[in-house]
């Protein structure tokens, strides 16, 4: 066993070394210079100077040309500007929410339009296929579709051929939707030839122009010619009754007899 004396000696030796270490640390702290204590009034003065500098900078940022640069004016102006900015922020938030809703609605409408376009395209393709099948099944359809469209020119004149009645003037008028001028075409009946009841008078008439070429001393009296009413008027214009037919014949013979007498005189 270790004797008590040695243990006590070791403990005494260890305590001496600890004291030496602590004494060395204390000496190092004492070597540094202690800072000067700042007075409370000086600290307050530094704070006020710093605040004044900050207020001056804020006043210059708000209104550089302002005459009154007091702290109260600067604080009031800053609070007013902050309120305006906050109100603008709120209005912008509301506008942003409304724009988001509108954009969502527009996106839905766009999708609906895309769906409608796709449906219309499918319907068009179905109709084209159906038309193609009908054209292939029915040759008449293909002939009609392949045949070029005939262009009917509009007539330059407004007169159409009309079957004319005998011995009657015919007027034809035609008016188109384009308000073409009305053209009237009149066809006059040919003058009826006189009945040659006396061939001798006809030969004498033929001989008169031949005598005009030469000078003749004998002057003949001209013979008047009066055409009968039946000769000038067309036969089919007025109906002839059987009772009046004899009267017309008798009047015609009497008229010819009078002409004969006048010619002989």
UniProtKB/Swiss-Prot annotation:
It is found in: Nucleus. Residues 245-256 have a biased composition (Polar residues). Residues 35-85 form the bHLH domain. This is Transcription factor BHLH062. PROSITE patterns: BHLH. Its main location: nucleus. Belongs to the bHLH protein family. Residues 210-220 have a biased composition (Basic and acidic residues). It comes from Oryza sativa subsp. japonica (Rice). InterPro entries: bHLH_dom, HLH_DNA-bd_sf. Transcription factor that plays a positive role in salt stress tolerance. Interacts with TIFY11A/JAZ9 and binds to the promoter of some potassium ion transporter genes to regulate potassium homeostasis during salt stress. GO terms for biological process: regulation of DNA-templated transcription. One of its GO terms (molecular function) is DNA binding. SUPFAM superfamilies: HLH, helix-loop-helix DNA-binding domain (SSF47459). Residues 75-130 form a coiled coil. Residues 1-26, 200-265 are annotated as: Disordered.
């Amino acid at each position: 066993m270790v004797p008590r004396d040695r243990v006590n000696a070791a403990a005494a030796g260890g305590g001496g070394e600890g004291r030496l270490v602590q004494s060395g640390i204390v000496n190092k702290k004492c070597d540094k210079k202690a800072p000067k204590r700042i007075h409370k009034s000086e600290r307050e003065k530094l704070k006020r100077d710093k605040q004044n500098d900050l207020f001056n900078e804020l006043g210059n940022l708000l209104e550089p040309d302002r005459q009154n640069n007091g702290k109260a004016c600067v604080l009031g102006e800053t609070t007013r500007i902050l309120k305006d900015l906050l109100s603008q922020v709120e209005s912008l938030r509301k506008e942003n929410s409304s724009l988001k809703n509108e954009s969502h609605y527009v996106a839905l409408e766009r999708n609906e339009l895309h769906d409608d376009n796709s449906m219309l395209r499918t319907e068009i393709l179905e109709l084209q296929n159906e038309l193609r099948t009908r054209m292939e099944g029915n040759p008449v359809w293909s002939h009609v579709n392949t045949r070029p469209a005939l262009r009917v020119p509009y007539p330059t004149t407004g007169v159409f051929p009309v079957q004319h009645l005998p011995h009657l003037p015919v007027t034809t008028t035609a008016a188109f939707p384009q308000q073409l001028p009305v053209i009237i075409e009149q066809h006059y009946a040919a003058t009826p030839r006189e009945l040659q009841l006396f061939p001798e008078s006809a030969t004498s008439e033929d001989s008169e122009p031949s005598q005009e070429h030469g000078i003749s001393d004998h002057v003949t009296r001209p013979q008047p010619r009066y055409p009968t009413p039946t000769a000038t008027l067309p036969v089919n214009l007025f109906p002839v009754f059987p009772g009046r037919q004899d009267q017309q014949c008798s009047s015609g013979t009497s008229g010819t007899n009078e002409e004969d007498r006048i010619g002989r005189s």
